[in-house]
Design a protein with these regions (language model features):
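Short, small/polar-rich motifs associated with maturation and membrane association
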Residues: 1-273, 277-288, 292, 334-335, ...
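Acidic/polar loop-and-plug regions of large Gram-negative outer-membrane beta-barrel proteins
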Residues: 292, 297-351
Length: 351
């Protein structure tokens, strides 16, 4: 419970216990993501595409409307609260729990109801997740290594029902021929914009037809520009052993995770040293030192590559003929000032 150990027979509280080896998923580098779908009554919500983003975890729904809704995490004992429960933006990407090496975890206990979390006080109102790390085993030193390599393919238009350039131009032509009313005529490299230029005599019929032909042939692959087939590799090495009186466990872990979106990467290193000393059946102590460092690169939370690739018309170019970024502009607003040009490629490269 974070304070004491109680057998399942002696507890009437709502508690779920899982072993780390039973939920280990190759290619997933954090234990909070591995818990998804494994604990009854627990929801794990991934709110970001960043490779090391912290999922939102809810146990038996929300216990408050405006306050913090996240459970308290406890790593071994004694009970200590963690700042990862903060909703501040600085805790959005990466946290102390995500820094744990999953290979170092023995069991995970989830305390759900009031009787189970009462010992933690008001901080346990949203549930408590207790993580017990591995200990040394009696015997000669045992060295273990675990490593894996995972390859994920990028999303593509084959997986989604989106119009290609020719279909988009045909759809726009049908809307105009049906006299549909546009709240705002699309600007930039669109059929509607070219048609408006033709009607206002800014371009000739031949120039209009040339623009339409160019639009139909463009077929910009936004998924290819913004995403990649990502590679993840993780490594874990540990040594354990000892006697009945003194047991030790030492480990080191490394992971390199490429995000599906270009420019989003996470590199993590962790280390753990743990010594258990037992004088007799009544007296003993545990000394533990752990260390973790994470280096993340990514994009701003207001930039969503998937939404952009999914929603942007394929008639829109990514680059101008001179190789510079193509900037899209909206029509002038009521102030008469034009909006600043935008392209997600520039946003990703300068975030």
């Amino acid at each position: 419970t974070g304070y004491q150990t109680i057998s399942r027979r002696e507890s009437a509280s709502a508690i779920s216990i899982v072993k780390a080896k039973d939920i280990m998923v190759q290619g997933v580098g954090s234990i909070d993501q591995m818990l998804q779908g494994r604990i009854p009554g627990m929801m794990v919500l991934n709110t970001s595409g960043e490779p090391s983003a912290t999922p939102k975890i809810r146990i038996r729904g929300n216990a408050t409307i405006n306050g913090n809704k996240s459970p308290v995490w406890v790593v071994d004992v004694p009970f200590t609260a963690s700042d990862i429960n903060s909703e501040d933006a600085e805790y959005l990407i990466g946290n102390a729990i995500a820094g744990l090496n999953p290979q170092d975890i023995e069991t995970i206990t989830v305390l759900k109801d009031a009787s189970a979390t009462a010992i933690c006080g008001v901080k346990g109102a949203n549930g408590v997740i207790v993580i017990t790390t591995k200990k040394g085993v009696v015997g000669r030193p045992v060295i273990s290594y675990n490593g894996n390599l995972t390859l994920n393919t990028r999303p593509s238009y084959k997986n989604y029902h989106r119009m290609n350039s020719q279909e988009r131009v045909l759809f726009s032509r049908q809307l105009i021929e049906s006299n549909m009313n546009f709240g705002r005529v699309p600007t930039g490299e669109t059929y509607e914009a070219a048609y408006e230029q033709l009607m206002s005599k800014q371009i000739s019929q031949a120039e209009f037809e040339q623009k339409v032909e160019t639009l139909q042939r463009r077929n910009t692959d936004w998924f290819d520009l913004l995403f990649r087939s990502d590679v993840t590799h993780t490594h874990a090495l540990n040594v354990s052993g000892g006697t009945e009186a003194v047991k030790y466990y030492v480990s080191a872990g490394y992971s390199n995770i490429e995000g599906a979106a270009r420019g989003s990467d996470s590199e993590k290193f962790s280390a753990l040293a743990k010594v258990d000393v037992e004088y007799n059946e009544y007296l003993g102590f545990t000394a533990k030192i752990d260390y973790a460092t994470t280096s993340n690169t990514g994009y701003s939370s207001v930039v969503n590559p998937f939404d952009y690739a999914y929603s942007t018309a394929r008639t829109m170019p990514a680059y101008n003929e001179d190789g510079s970024y193509y900037m899209s502009y909206r029509a002038a607003g009521s102030t008469g000032r034009d909006y600043i040009g935008y392209t997600i490629l520039k946003e990703l490269n300068n975030t």
